[in-house]
């Protein structure tokens, strides 16, 4: 779980050009100023990184929610 | 197949993002950051035939042949000025040609579909000279009340004359049907015996995120495959031309394939998405600017409604034209650089 969290934080930080440390499980996607194509690219990055399929509508709520989605998909 | 001549034409009317701000709830910043588009060319009247003919005449002049020398005219277009006759027939008349003529519809991938079709006719010995045109008046199909899609499009035409040769090193066409991702309903007409469809026609409808993901992943797969078929890697190409659909797609493909931006010219910032016309328009600008040299390898990749895609590797065979036309900023900075 921590490994997934750190990779998601890194992918998000790279997309935003920010520091991964700023992103926690409680961070809300709405607060990250991502546009719809940023979200599409994030999902593509994470699908490649974890070899899973992610429903893009699940990139909602908090970063921790997405980490759980990826963990379940990876099992 | 070799490209013997090339030409293009754009409508004169320029429509800027600021002009769109006047009637749409949008902004130049919104459009530029999401698409890389700052302006586009929009037809003032139904003039696609005129544009396609102008592009064709330039391509014939460049090839040094006349309309009578053509064995076929193939026009990749979503919809011409007329439902029928085809745009290809109207061009035939304008060129005083006497050959078979037909339109081919593969949305934004149409030009590469048409190139492969032309190559097949030439390889089969059924034709020597084929005019292949990409011509689109896509702005008249857009819903100009939908700020998410109407800002994307522009009109234009590009044409090549092809003949026998070994210039087309590899090609790949794909189709993976997904209507909902990107579609436009046909006008139902007024047939009293047929019930009107539940959904009213309303211009282009697009699931932007789905199309984006398809475009990026399909383009990468196609480019890798056509480069491998040509015995090379994408990174070894002299030029990589992507369908000018959205600067964000182009940047995402470039980053994932680790390509040098200097090998990926673009004109979307001033043309918008011209669908099947975008690749021949860009290729013509590069040729006229003196960027294309004999022996150079050019990978091209396009994708669009269907969903369909087409990609190919060409070995360029023509010397630059004697009179060069400097291309206006073919290498603008990526759109997704954030402050």
Predicted segments with their positions:
Chain B
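Condensing-enzyme catalytic core mediating Claisen C-C bond formation in acyl metabolism
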Residues: 1-45, 146-213, 217, 221, ...
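Acidic-glycine-rich active-site phosphate/pyrophosphate-binding loop
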Residues: 24-31, 82-95, 132-138, 189-196, ...
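Claisen-condensing/thiolase-fold acyl-transfer catalytic domains that form or cleave C-C bonds
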Residues: 49, 53-56, 60, 79-80, ...
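Short beta-strand segments
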Residues: 7, 76, 105, 130-136, ...
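Short glycine-rich phosphate-binding loop at a beta-alpha junction
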Residues: 68-76, 234-243
């Amino acid at each position: 779980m921590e490994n997934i969290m750190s990779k998601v934080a890194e992918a998000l930080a790279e997309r935003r050009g920010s520091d991964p440390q700023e992103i926690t499980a409680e961070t809300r996607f709405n607060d990250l100023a991502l546009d719809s194509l940023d979200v599409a690219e994030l999902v593509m990055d994470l699908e490649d990184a974890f070899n899973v399929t992610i429903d893009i509508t699940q990139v909602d709520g908090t970063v921790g929610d997405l980490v759980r989605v990826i963990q379940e998909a990876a099992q | 197949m070799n490209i013997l001549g090339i030409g293009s034409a754009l409508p004169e009317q320029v429509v800027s993002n600021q002009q769109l701000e006047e009637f749409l709830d949008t902004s130049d910043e919104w459009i530029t950051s999401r698409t890389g588009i700052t302006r586009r060319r929009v037809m003032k009247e139904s003039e696609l035939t005129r544009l396609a003919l102008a592009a064709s005449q330039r391509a014939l002049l460049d090839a040094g042949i006349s309309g009578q020398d053509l064995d076929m005219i193939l026009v990749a277009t979503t919809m011409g000025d007329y439902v029928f006759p085809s745009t290809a027939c109207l061009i035939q008349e304008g060129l005083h040609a006497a050959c078979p003529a037909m339109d081919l519809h593969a949305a934004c991938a149409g030009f590469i579909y048409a190139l492969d079709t032309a190559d097949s006719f030439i390889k089969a010995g059924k034709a020597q000279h084929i005019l292949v045109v990409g011509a689109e008046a896509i702005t008249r199909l857009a819903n100009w009340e939908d700020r998410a899609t109407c800002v994307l499009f522009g009109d234009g035409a590009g044409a090549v004359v092809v003949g026998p040769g070994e210039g087309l090193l590899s090609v790949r066409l794909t189709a993976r049907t997904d209507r909902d991702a990107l579609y436009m309903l046909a006008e139902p007409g007024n047939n009293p015996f047929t019930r009107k469809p539940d959904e009213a026609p309303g211009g282009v409808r697009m699931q932007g995120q789905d199309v984006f993901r398809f475009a990026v992943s399909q383009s990468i797969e196609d480019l890798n495959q056509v480069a491998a078929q040509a015995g090379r890697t994408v990174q070894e190409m002299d030029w990589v031309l992507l369908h000018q659909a959205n600067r964000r797609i182009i940047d995402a493909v470039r980053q994932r394939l680790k390509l040098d931006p200097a090998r990926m010219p673009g004109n979307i910032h001033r043309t918008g998405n011209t669908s099947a016309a975008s690749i021949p328009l860009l290729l013509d600008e590069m040729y006229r600017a003196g960027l294309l040299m004999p022996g150079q390898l050019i990978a091209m990749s396009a994708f669009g409604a269907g969903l369909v895609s087409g990609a190919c590797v060409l070995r360029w065979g023509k010397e630059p034209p004697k009179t060069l036309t400097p291309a206006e900023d073919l290498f603008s900075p990526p759109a997704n650089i954030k402050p």
